A protein has these predicted regions:
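Short, contiguous pre-domain boundary segments
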Residues: 2-31
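Short, well-structured alpha-helical segments
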Residues: 35-46, 61, 82, 110-117, ...
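Internal insertion modules embedded within essential enzymes
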Residues: 14-19, 98, 106-109, 115-279, ...
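General structural signal for alpha-helix termini and helix-helix connectors
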Residues: 25-28, 47, 51-54, 73, ...
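Alpha-helical phosphate/pyrophosphate-handling elements in metalloenzyme active cores
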Residues: 40, 50-82, 86, 90-100
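Short, mixed-charge amphipathic alpha-helical segments
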Residues: 25-41, 97-109
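Structural motif
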Residues: 31-36, 58-61, 74-77, 141-147, ...
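Active-site flanking loop/helix segments enriched in acidic
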Residues: 29, 41-70, 120-138, 414
Length: 475
């Protein structure tokens, strides 16, 4: 009797295992138990892609299943998104229409699948105008349903995870496109884990030798990092327990791409980067106690033990980043004379940091009146997209500026925080306060020192604007 397994039977087993894994993750999520709906979408997609293989040799249906798994497990989305992910290639690759999807699964799923079909393929065309138009289509979908863009990012993530089956030239092009547009887009939507993986996978295919070098360096220094973490945590644990907290404290290592990027920007070696290692403290919220106050209690407990570096405090609990990120960051001198970055966040903050937009809306349901920085950014993007006939290059530059902009956080004399783009000047700050203040300003004090209005601001600066009633705006 032959021991060779029937290839078709092996494929069937592979497919069933992937679907069972998806259902298991879904049943352990917080969403309604719409298993029948998901099973129906899976059965439909499986039939539509029957007999089709990917370049890797596996059945094509494994790709929609993997995208659905990312959407469910890594983004925390529900059955509508899972079904849409399962069906996202049916209209493009099989003999079905959006109308067929609508008849089978309803308007909402059909609209999402239609949006995904319109933006299928790559963003980079041969010319800037084609590139701009493709990216415009991609971002326009945010107006109708943010889930289109989230599923598209999940689709790109799985394609990057399986990029090894493609020819090197194709790998290089897709990796470049991912690093140029998809990783910043994931970052702007708060998908930190996915953004990091997209960057690292792109780095792996664009700069394989540098990627391997950094991974070897990380591996060779792993034992020393583990010892540093144990020495650091030993005196901190009793302090946190004394606060009555349920928490976890773990070590976090900077991603390969982030390390390489910092080496390039600062012109330093691997050994010269001191923040490769960080400690993350995640606590469960206490009843009737504001999470912000708990963050500062933990801060006090740590600074009772270790010497702080004041210029490295980053307070994103008082005001979140534009992508919804909240945490309190500080840097202290560790037990072995090394600087250690610490990130303090609640479980809610951690979920928003890792799952981004999906978690943002989950927690926002009970606070509809809040108008967050993320909402403002989406509104800005919408306004840009509504420009009827943008110049292709101007459009791409504008969008990239909005995707890549790093915020700085500055203070008024009363201690109010204002968010400005990186490289903002004292004059930009004046206009951010009010148009009239911008028009009447004659100078500024930054950290109590007189500076010209062209002075570039940095995070943590305190700015006082000097005005004159007689000052008139310059034409």
């Amino acid at each position: 009797m032959s021991n060779v397994k029937d290839p078709k039977a092996a494929d069937e087993q592979l497919i069933q295992q992937a679907f069972d894994s998806l259902l298991n993750d879904y049943l352990h999520s917080n969403h309604r138990r719409k298993v029948e709906r998901i099973t129906k979408a899976f059965t439909f997609a499986r039939h539509a892609h029957d007999g089709v293989k990917r370049l890797s040799g596996e059945p094509y249906i494994m790709h929609p299943l993997a995208v659905a798994q990312i959407v469910c497990s890594e983004m925390g989305l529900g059955s509508t998104s899972i079904c849409s992910a399962l069906l996202h290639d049916v209209v493009e690759d099989a003999d079905y229409t959006v109308e067929d999807i609508k008849n089978m699964f309803g308007d909402k799923i059909a609209q999402i699948v239609d949006g995904l079909t319109k933006i299928s393929g790559g963003i980079f065309g041969e010319q800037a105008s084609a590139q701009a138009e493709n990216f415009r289509k991609l971002l326009l979908t945010m107006n109708n349903d943010i889930r289109v863009i989230l599923i598209k990012i999940a689709d790109r993530l799985h394609n990057m995870r399986t990029l090894g089956a493609m020819l090197p030239a194709k790998q290089y092009k897709i990796a470049g496109e991912t690093l140029y547009l998809y990783a910043p887009l994931a970052h702007r939507l708060g998908l930190f884990s996915i953004k990091t993986e997209l960057e690292d996978l792109s780095f792996k295919y664009e700069h394989p030798e540098e990627y391997d070098f950094i991974h070897q360096q990380l591996k060779s220094t792993e034992k020393a990092r583990n010892m540093l973490f144990e020495h650091f945590a030993a005196p901190v644990d009793p302090k946190l327990k004394a606060l009555g907290l349920t928490y976890e404290m773990r070590a976090r290592v900077k991603s390969a791409y982030s390390i390489w990027n910092k080496m390039q920007v600062k012109g330093v070696s691997f050994e010269d980067i001191y923040d490769i290692f960080a400690v993350r403290i995640i606590f469960e919220s206490l009843p009737d106690v504001d999470d912000k106050n708990v963050c500062w209690d933990i801060y006090s407990a740590i600074t009772d033990i270790y010497r702080i570096r004041p210029d490295r405090i980053r307070d994103w609990v008082s005001r979140s980043k534009a992508n919804g990120y909240q945490a309190l960051h500080l840097t202290v001198m560790g037990p072995d004379g090394q600087w250690v970055e610490i990130q303090i966040r609640s479980r809610r903050m951690d979920e928003i940091a890792e799952k981004g937009f999906a978690a943002h809306w989950k927690y926002k349901e009970n606070h509809v009146e809040e108008d967050t920085e993320l909402d403002k950014w989406l509104q800005t993007i919408t306004e840009i997209l509504e420009n009827p006939d943008p110049n292709a290059l101007d459009f791409l530059d504008t969008i990239k500026m909005n995707l890549f902009t790093t915020e700085i956080f500055v203070f008024t004399p009363k201690g109010d925080i204002k968010t400005l783009p990186q490289n903002a000047t004292a004059l930009d700050f004046a206009f951010a306060l009010h148009t009239n203040i911008g028009n009447k300003c004659i100078g500024a004090k930054v950290n109590h020192r007189l500076v010209p209005l062209s002075h570039r601001l940095s995070s943590g600066d305190q700015i006082e604007i000097l005005t004159s009633r007689s000052q008139q705006p310059q034409a």
